[in-house]
Amino acid sequence: MQQIQKVKAREIFNSRGWPTIEVEVTTSCGRVGCAIAPSGASKGVLEACELLDGDKARLSGRGVLRAVENVHTIIAPALMGKSVAAQAEIDSLLIQLDGTTNKSVLGANAIVAVSLAVAKANASVRGVPLCIVFHNLLTSEGDDFVYVPPVPMLNVINGGVHADNRLAIQEFMICPVGRRSFRESMEKAADVFHRLKGLLKQYGKSTNVGDEGGFAPDLSSTEETLGLLSEAIGDSKESVKIALDAASSTFYKDGKYSIDGKLLNVNEMVDFYAAIIEKYDIVSIEDPLYESDWESWQVMTRKLSDKIHIVGDDIFVTNPKIIKKGIKTGVANAVLVKINQVGTVTETIESIKLARKAGYKVVISHRSGETEDLSIAHLAVACGGAFLKAGSLSRSERVAKYNEVLRLEEVFV
């Protein structure tokens, strides 16, 4: 009953209006798992390769029909008769079929959609939520699931490559902490979100939104933005903190960081972060430095890791081998997890296990090109107490993730 009987792929569209791939896995008992590959705007140089058609005459070369064909002609025949419960075996086969370190032959977009669809089909066969399948992969067999609410990180002001404004830092987030439930966290976040919108209108700023649903006003500097965000948080500062995704590789060139009209060297950049941490209630900074500058990451980790979460995204790309190196060399103290960065459920689970064992905080994350797929909500719930970074409280493909956690909370509490 658990055997794979059919694998079907199709080209659909993501929240940025570009094609992506959706995969359906059907079992011999008629159960179906359906998953969609997300897509990033700012990508780590070592992350798994999204396979695009490259035909400029069609969809600016960003079609994914080659990835769809790879599912139908290469992956599907190899998976026929396999059990959807054999996640590790199937993911290993997908990696073997591709044969490259970055999944560039079949495409990480094809592979991740298949891998997630298998996990969802398994959940359907078992009659359990997807988060239970993820929990079983994360823990020893027989361990009971204990619900611990994720902590939302909501990207309320967009900058960098996610918005058409002057802000170098890509994401300014609010993070409700210390709440007893995810619902309480979201209610607190919603209050701040609407106060921020009111302040933007009051100051004559645009309330248009960026790729991830956050406001994208034309603010002039990091300090102006943090000041505005602090004003919106107001009396809630004990329970609502600020988190940043600098995505610093996007404003780094020739050894300098171009931010707020200045060119800073790495020491000045670290001092910049230290200063704003002292001034504002910042609890987390993601990708604060250039992704290939491991030595400077070590310096910043030693200097600031007792004050904030230093989150590795582009530097780690959810790759267990790279995360292992980071842990060994003292780089960062938190790991951002994006399933499509590494390409399979099994490798993602391994990365989370490594991070947790080393005492690193785990942040489950969306991408800028998202869809209605809810897998990351289930992964965040499975991790127990992890951060969930899924965008803002506008754009349905973002809010859907938070709403799914609210539904799951009702099931487990």
Curated annotation (Swiss-Prot):
Q: What EC class is this?
A: lyase
Q: Which reaction does it catalyse?
A: (2R)-2-phosphoglycerate = phosphoenolpyruvate + H2O
Q: Which GO terms describe its biological process?
A: glycolytic process
In short, the EC number is 4.2.1.11
* Keywords for this protein: Cytoplasm, Glycolysis, Lyase, Magnesium, Metal-binding, Secreted
Q: List the disulfide bonds.
A: none
Q: What is its main location?
A: cytoplasm
Residues bound to Mg(2+): D245, E286, D313
Cofactor(s) this protein cannot do without: Mg(2+)
Extract the coiled-coil ranges from the record. none
Q: Does the keyword Secreted apply?
A: yes
Cofactor: binding comment: Binds a second Mg(2+) ion via substrate during catalysis.
List the SMART domains hit by this protein, alphabetically: Enolase_C, Enolase_N
Q: Which residues form the active site?
A: E212, K338
- Which residues participate in (2R)-2-phosphoglycerate binding? Q170, K338, R367, S368, K389
Plastid: present as a keyword of the record?
Answer: no
**A UniProt-annotated Pfam family:** Enolase_C
Subcellular localization, as worded in the UniProt entry: Cytoplasm; Secreted; Cell surface
Annotated pathway: Carbohydrate degradation; glycolysis; pyruvate from D-glyceraldehyde 3-phosphate: step 4/5
NCBIfam families assigned to the protein according to its UniProt record, in alphabetical order: eno
Please report which protein family the annotation says this sequence is part of. Answer: Belongs to the enolase family.
| Functional summary from the UniProt entry | Catalyzes the reversible conversion of 2-phosphoglycerate (2-PG) into phosphoenolpyruvate (PEP). It is essential for the degradation of carbohydrates via glycolysis.
Protein name stated in the entry:
Enolase
